[in-house]
Amino acid sequence: MVEFSDAILEPIGAVQRTRVGREATEPMRADIRLLGTILGDTLREQNGDEVFDLVERVRVESFRVRRSEIDRADMARMFSGLDIHLAIPIIRAFSHFALLANVAEDIHRERRRHIHLDAGEPLRDSSLAATYAKLDLAKLDSATVADALTGAVVSPVITAHPTETRRRTVFVTQRRITELMRLHAEGHTETADGRSIERELRRQILTLWQTALIRLARLQISDEIDVGLRYYSAALFHVIPQVNSEVRNALRARWPDAELLSGPILQPGSWIGGDRDGNPNVTADVVRRATGSAAYTVVAHYLAELTHLEQELSMSARLITVTPELATLAASCQDAACADEPYRRALRVIRGRLSSTAAHILDQQPPNQLGLGLPPYSTPAELCADLDTIEASLCTHGAALLADDRLALLREGVGVFGFHLCGLDMRQNSDVHEEVVAELLAWAGMHQDYSSLPEDQRVKLLVAELGNRRPLVGDRAQLSDLARGELAVLAAAAHAVELYGSAAVPNYIISMCQSVSDVLEVAILLKETGLLDASGSQPYCPVGISPLFETIDDLHNGAAILHAMLELPLYRTLVAARGNWQEVMLGYSDSNKDGGYLAANWAVYRAELALVDVARKTGIRLRLFHGRGGTVGRGGGPSYQAILAQPPGAVNGSLRLTEQGEVIAAKYAEPQIARRNLESLVAATLESTLLDVEGLGDAAESAYAILDEVAGLARRSYAELVNTPGFVDYFQASTPVSEIGSLNIGNRPTSRKPTTSIADLRAIPWVLAWSQSRVMLPGWYGTGSAFQQWVAAGPESESQRVEMLHDLYQRWPFFRSVLSNMAQVLAKSDLGLAARYAELVVDEALRRRVFDKIADEHRRTIAIHKLITGHDDLLADNPALARSVFNRFPYLEPLNHLQVELLRRYRSGHDDEMVQRGILLTMNGLASALRNSG
């Protein structure tokens, strides 16, 4: 019998020491020491010796706890009754250290990458260079590649998150520290203008220390919009055009007779300001603010780049001869100061026309405008054509090199960003659509009780209405606040499409989509606001309708719903009008909350297989949109591995995925890191589309059958926990979920409805609360029991069954990804600290009943991971993360202890502003340190 004894289990709360070469990590540790020393000096100078000595004592004791030299209860006693005015600087010190440690780790990853490249080591998986090498070996023909990459799109979609609330000042300061540490890593002691790097670091860390990390007021959607847009100027404006251009050139060089990637492959998106599901704060004004701010940001970028180009392209007509097209373009500028500088005059014409465009489409006017009274550009394509004229002319007189830098990036940028910057998705819950459509139908006299109709009659009625051009209601209709609000939001979306182009609002996503009528109801609402017309031979539908299948049951039924949608001739004409593309979104968060980690992941995989089959049989092109959170419990984990883990046919040259929370800052705040992450998305998409990456071959069906069984067992185990009497009370008492809702964290309510049901709780607070309390339950619970039961069930021997699972781990990217992501969560969990949170549960019997189940399953899951993978260490396959976890654990320790202490005070009535601020600071500090907490 396979032994699951304590001998192979890590003790709860133990640090799993990793075998990491000290030589490789010494530069990173040196960077951390440097930043930590400067932070300590700043703390002493600003807060005095008493606070410094206390922070240093806490740091030393934290390391002693990790080495098991003292008991955790000793550390807890340090904070019991600690004056809040001393607790706050301790929290701030360790939170700041987490930010600075993140900087050091990011710099070290770059350092190691360059070392490996310089040493001529094999290309790293997830890099485009490695992907091109794999494609070269595959010897694919042009027709296959051209067909597979038709309409290829990789779209990271930025979404709001309550813990990613760093103020712009903190963001900018952290970026400056990163730039300085990069110079330091390159061996410099001074900046380009001769200033001491260490002195500049001290200045920036002092600024950071004297700047509030969090806002006192509740985060507004306008703040979240600004947070999302900051990443464009930080990195994306430059990196996305670079990657798009390089990928297109690389693929066309390999298959020159195929017309590949006619459009940009990387196309960013956003939900911030368009996601209304459970968030009444998203109104028509917010949609206008989101789309208008995005347009302002991109037009301002273009104007600034054109101004730079005017300074750079100073060639004189006395020395070069331009093309007739360039001369014609320049002729519209009569500026005598640059009379013999045709490129400057041409660029001033372009800037003048773009200034007229800004005046036409923007409420707020950006800098660098030029009022020449010229007509505005009606489309981004017109702007691209003028930039092409400049490029073509430069190439005729030996100046192609000058066209290959800023001008090329600007031209490429206009091709992807247009006048809209990023596509803003609309999202709302299907229940809301039903209620509004029922009201519209009743007002129009078409049916007085639509909600009472069975599904087939609903579909018949809605199809008939969609075939009729006239709207259901007019401006004078007396509608409810809900209906007026929903129609106003869509009217604002229609206005954005009119001003900025159809790419401004590309999709409408239906949360909790469970039927064909749920899809058609959205079509009715789009029709009411001028965003859909299916009455004629040429349907108009600039906004695609994307059903979102979220629960495990809905994922199971998704393919049948898609097939029924496509069986409707009217809906099929809408799909044809959109290039035969149909997008379907898959929800990882609610499926996880519904059935647990393993069951949810397998439900998504099975849903993808079925959806791909429907697409193949009906002849449409399927684009899957993955609603992944930052955490493993919400579908997170390394994107490259996650994409390769998709089933055959599921990527199909195109995918979208959400990017959330601290993950956005970790991936896109710096150009080098942003490039690496965007490269990995494109690389995985190309490999999944063009190569056989599943690796199962004829064994696929037997592997699927195993996962069917294990996922069912995992769902049952998870259900036993969440259905334990009193579980909701335990969850609310042993985590900060209540405080997430009551304090100023995010603008969105923590529940979709005003209930205490887990089913109604939003996924982000569910996962965030378990992360803060270091249980990380959504990322692993139920998996250990499921595999243990399956191994014991026969008919093969237990050792044979373990070997079968080990073989799947070796061969199957999906299975390997599931276990690897789970291991990352388990490594960051700490049941010793979780026990401290459990002490907040007043009912001792309830505490023991639930916590003992969690602790037993935690041990069991670590044990089964070891058996299947053969690895003693959870992070044996990810040494970089192993280093990160090991290095930062001692600095997480005091943040968790202080959070428990302050939660106890807050709940006992000590709810003064300082205690609330302390709780908020611990939440943000832990989120920064864990880097993917929600």
UniProtKB/Swiss-Prot annotation:
* Entry's family note: Belongs to the PEPCase type 1 family.
Q: Which organism is it from?
A: Mycobacterium leprae (strain TN)
This chain's protein is named Phosphoenolpyruvate carboxylase
Domain of life from the UniProt record: Bacteria
Q: Name one GO molecular function term.
A: magnesium ion binding
Q: Which reaction does it catalyse?
A: oxaloacetate + phosphate = phosphoenolpyruvate + hydrogencarbonate
Q: Which GO terms describe its cellular component?
A: cytosol
Q: Quick check: keyword Amino-acid biosynthesis in the entry?
A: no
Q: Name one Pfam family in it.
A: PEPcase
Q: Which Gene3D superfamilies match?
A: Phosphoenolpyruvate/pyruvate domain (1.20.1440.90)
- HAMAP family this protein is in? PEPcase_type1
User: What is the stated purpose of this protein?
Assistant: Forms oxaloacetate, a four-carbon dicarboxylic acid source for the tricarboxylic acid cycle.
**Catalytic residues?**
161, 593
According to its UniProt record, which cofactors does this protein need? Mg(2+)
* NCBIfam families named in the record: PRK00009.1
| One biological process term in Gene Ontology | oxaloacetate metabolic process
E.C. number, please? Answer: 4.1.1.31
Q: Which UniProt keywords apply?
A: Carbon dioxide fixation, Lyase, Magnesium
